[in-house]
Amino acid sequence: MAAQVEIEDQESVTNLDNGEIINPISDNAPNFSGDATILLREATFEHNLIKNCFLSGMGSFATETTIVTVRKILTQRLITTKAKFAVFKLFTEAMKRKNNGYANIRYGWYSGSKEEIDRVITYGFSNREIKKVENDVGSHGVGIHLVHHRYSLAAALVGEGDEEGIKNILLCRVILGKPEQIVTGSKQSYPSSNQFDSGVDNLENPRKYVIWSCNMNSYILPTYIVSFKSHLLRGLIGRARSPCVSFSVLMSILSKSLDAARMNLILTSYDDFRKRKLRREQLVRKIREVVGDNLLFKILKNQRR
């Protein structure tokens, strides 16, 4: 397992905005938004920091995950990215004034298809991203959902890969301000009062951050794109035509390892999935909650042999 790597919140990675020497773009490297990004050279401090941060949050899946590229979104090259960076700094200062000098800036992962991430980098977040969680019974409010930087696996699991199995994930700087706890399944879409600025799943140990639509392009600044491959993840949540283990086979394997109560929880969710009441990523999330990542990892790895 990758060693735990901590990205200092607030200003640590902020100070890396001077740029990096870059590698030539390889033929299979995802290409994002032209001049808005640069490809970071492997083994440099900045590349390793982001790579290790991602892998340290992948748990058992880290050893079966390959980083393809790490790209940096430049804040000073284009007029649009300059403007977004200026807006983010402006709202950071405003949040400090509101909350006694503390803006509470964090780092969070956001997953999506290459096309979605490219669109977010170019134009910002929109209602298309909000709609992803509107009907999700497991969401914590209706807004832009990001995952704490220590728990990248949760974001990696729901990302959509391309035909070569490459998935992409954004590391964003996020202004949380004073968050409020949002319960699972909530349809809340804005702060409950002027006292609060954002939402979290848990106040003591947050894993999910929720930024409301009214602030989504002010409180979130996309900073890095990690492109990666994992045959185990592709097998679990990839297209139905090419999984390494089908859900029906997985149900059979799990029935030999789980007690009746836990197995019934999974079978109920699986039945909802087949009736199209649940999306694939929602079923995967339920399986993770009930089974645990370690057992799931062992099952998927054994099926690859």
Curated annotation (Swiss-Prot):
GO MF, one example: NAD+ poly-ADP-ribosyltransferase activity
Main location: nucleus
One cellular-component annotation, GO: nucleus
UniProt key word Nucleus: yes
Pfam families, A to Z: RST
Iron is among the record's keywords: no
Gene3D superfamilies the record matches: 3.90.228.10
Superkingdom as given in the UniProt entry: Eukaryota
Compartment(s) where it occurs, according to its Swiss-Prot or TrEMBL record: Nucleus
Domain PARP catalytic: 23-249
Residue ranges of domain RST in the record: 238-305
Keyword terms of this UniProt record: Developmental protein, Nucleus, Stress response
Induction summary: By salt stress.
SUPFAM superfamilies, A to Z: ADP-ribosylation (SSF56399)
Function: Probable inactive ADP-ribosyltransferase that may be involved in stress and developmental responses.
Subunit structure: Interacts with STO.
The protein's name in its UniProt record: Probable inactive poly [ADP-ribose] polymerase SRO3
The organism of origin for this protein: Arabidopsis thaliana
